[in-house]
Amino acid sequence: MARVKRGVIARARHKKVLKAAKGYYGARSRVYRVAFQAVIKAGQYAYRDRRQRKRQFRQLWIARINAAARQNGLSYSKFINGLKKASVEIDRKILADIAVFDKVAFAALVEKAKSAL
């Protein structure tokens, strides 16, 4: 049976991992063993945080809507309930955008929600 030399494959694999670890601190960007673990962990964090990002943005939108609604004399939960009763189907992302950039339109939405309650 012929001897299999794997130098080329190993070098390519190491190069790939070290390229992925570029910019990491200290040995994490230079030593293959440490870099491999760092890249694996980074992948785990990325996977987890892609899901967390969705939650965090929703939290941010709700906080912004709540702040704007309270300035207009209504709590967040009552505001959302009023919008649902008034059949206004605007999602939280757009509501937060309106709350930040168009105060007059948001005040009109609050009045519509108040009248539906």
From Swiss-Prot:
<dbReference type="InterPro" id="IPR035566">
    <property type="entry name" value="Ribosomal_protein_bL20_C"/>
</dbReference>
<dbReference type="InterPro" id="IPR049946">
    <property type="entry name" value="RIBOSOMAL_L20_CS"/>
</dbReference>
<keyword id="KW-0687">Ribonucleoprotein</keyword>
<dbReference type="GO" id="GO:0000027">
    <property type="term" value="P:ribosomal large subunit assembly"/>
</dbReference>
<keyword id="KW-0694">RNA-binding</keyword>
<dbReference type="Pfam" id="PF00453">
    <property type="entry name" value="Ribosomal_L20"/>
</dbReference>
<protein>
    <recommendedName>
        <fullName>Large ribosomal subunit protein bL20</fullName>
    </recommendedName>
</protein>
<dbReference type="GO" id="GO:0019843">
    <property type="term" value="F:rRNA binding"/>
</dbReference>
<dbReference type="GO" id="GO:0006412">
    <property type="term" value="P:translation"/>
</dbReference>
<keyword id="KW-0699">rRNA-binding</keyword>
<dbReference type="InterPro" id="IPR005813">
    <property type="entry name" value="Ribosomal_bL20"/>
</dbReference>
<comment type="similarity">
    <text>Belongs to the bacterial ribosomal protein bL20 family.</text>
</comment>
<dbReference type="GO" id="GO:0003735">
    <property type="term" value="F:structural constituent of ribosome"/>
</dbReference>
<keyword id="KW-0689">Ribosomal protein</keyword>
<dbReference type="GO" id="GO:1990904">
    <property type="term" value="C:ribonucleoprotein complex"/>
</dbReference>
<comment type="function">
    <text>Binds directly to 23S ribosomal RNA and is necessary for the in vitro assembly process of the 50S ribosomal subunit. It is not involved in the protein synthesizing functions of that subunit.</text>
</comment>
<dbReference type="GO" id="GO:0005840">
    <property type="term" value="C:ribosome"/>
</dbReference>
